[in-house]
Structures are given as structure tokens and as C-alpha cells.
Amino acid sequence: MVAKKIKVFLQWAVALAVGFCIVNLLCMGYERLVGWIETPNGPSPAHWNPGTILVHGTEGYGITKIDQNGYINPDGTLEDSHILCMGSSHTQGKELPSGKNYTALLNTHFAAGEGSLAAYNIACDGNFLPSLIKHFPAAVEAFPNASAITIEISNTDISVEELEYALEQAEYVQDQTAQLGLVSKLKMLIKEYFPLLNLIKSKLETAASAAPAGAEAVSQHAAALLREALELIRSQYDGEIIFIYHQQTGIAQDGTIVFDEDRLFDVFAQACQDNGIRLLDMRPVFVEYYNLHQELPYGFANTRPGNGHLNKLGHRLIAEALIPYLEEAMA
């Protein structure tokens, strides 16, 4: 009797193991993120494991090769005069086929020839306005020949605590992540070769995430710190700085496109103007295109249209809007 139970248990264990291996193998072609290396003193808070292949199929579909620096860029040599592109996962464009994000489109327009890179993408997941400000001087030092810097943001409504964090800017340290510990290497291997585990973990975290707290009145302290932050980054770079501002969209019951409230946007816009920083507000462009063609610049997230990342249309519209302003900087 005991032997029979052991046999049944082993059969189930083998079946589960085989099933896991099959599904894990299928995930290799559906959703395979790669190792994530933190760079607290780098041009961005983190980057991907250099030289790996990232597969992202849970929203759109993209197969992306990570470059030698851990970012999403085509193979090629960076030109002496180039555009440095900072931002979040929207700018990365890992949901798209290769060559369809706006930095690749800028490169196609400005590059001197095949094998040259005129635009370089250092965006990373979760790299929003506070961390963009924090890592700005490190980015300038890491890429001293940048003729222009674009910074993609989707929200300016940030707290005093986030702004205080941002103003404690990172001091650039080159090659700070050359040596990874054993635990970090093990985590990276699990993430890259067991994508099913990573997918399950991601879904559980999404399900457990809490709804955002209700909005409070705009803090005058936060407004003052935001103005200080923009004045600071202006002092750290003499070239063209362009903030690309966009907001994820929704569709109202009457079919019109709507955006969430951003209470600090007016303060941010005035601070950009006061410091000679260009602000490219993509909302009117997106609304005009939607009204003409009924097509959104964002994908789906959790079945809600317009709540996902920038899609091919969104990236193309951003590239088209940027090019006239970058022509002079790249001349």
C-alpha cells in the first residue's frame, strides 16, 4: 500500500516537473525578461544584463537585444554629436518590434550612415521624474558629447519626499557594477532561464497592488522644490533639454479622449519656461490624431484601452514632434 502511494506520488511529481518544463520553454518565446543590474550612481537607476535577449509578449510583442551597456539600442557606434534619450519603460519600447521606438526613429532620421547611432536610449523601467532628476548629472557625465537631451515623463504630480530624494543627486561612478555577488548572479539566472516563475511573480504582485490614495491639495513646498529641481538640471547642462510630456489616456462614455489630472503641471510648465527648457506636451497631438483616426497612442493593460505603454503610433508621433526641435541642435 505504501509502495503504491509512493509510486503515485512520484508519477505526479514527474508529470508536474515535465509540465513545468514545457510551459517554461513556451514562456521563453512569450515573456522572458532578463537580469536587472542596479546602478545607484549610474546614468539611470538600473540597466538590463548586457548582451542578452529580452522577449516581452504580455503587452504587444517585442524581441529585443540588449546592448553592451545594458540598454535597448541598435548595434552601432555612437556618433560624437548625439541625442541622449532618458525616460521610463515607455521610452524603452520593449513592447514593440525592433526599430519602432521613437529613439530608433530619431536615429534613422539623424544618423550619418549605417552602423552609426545619433540617438542613444538610456531609459529603464520605473524611471520617473524623481529618479530622472536624481540621475541627470550622472547621465551628463557619462555622455559628455550629447548635443541634446530628451526626457520622457508622464506625470509631474510628485510628493515633497520624492522631490527631496531627487535633489540628492547621484554622483557618477563608472563601471560600478562590474562585480556582482553570488546571490545577484543567481537571481539573474533564475529570471532569465525560468521565465514562468517570473511571470507568476509579476501577476501576483499586480493582483496584490493597492489602489492609489486620494489626491490632496497641491503643496507649495512641493511646487518650490520642483522649481528648484528644474533650475538645478538647467545649471548642469548647457545644451537643448526637451521634456516629452504625455499622459496615459482613457475613453469617456461619449467617446472622447480623457487624461488624468496632474496638479503640478502648470508649475512644471512655468519652471521649464523660466529656465529655458523646452516642454513638448504631446496631449494635443494625441487628441488631434484620435479625433481624426479614432486610434489611441497607447496599448491595452488589463483589458482597458489606452492604459498600456506607448504603442507604435505613440512612438511615431513623438519622433515626428521632436525632429523639428532637434534639427538645430544636431546641425
Predicted segments with their positions:
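Hydrophobic membrane-insertion alpha-helices, especially the h-region
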Residues: Q11-M28
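Membrane/wall-proximal cationic-aromatic binding patches
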Residues: Y30-G113, F286-Y289, H293-P297, A301, ...
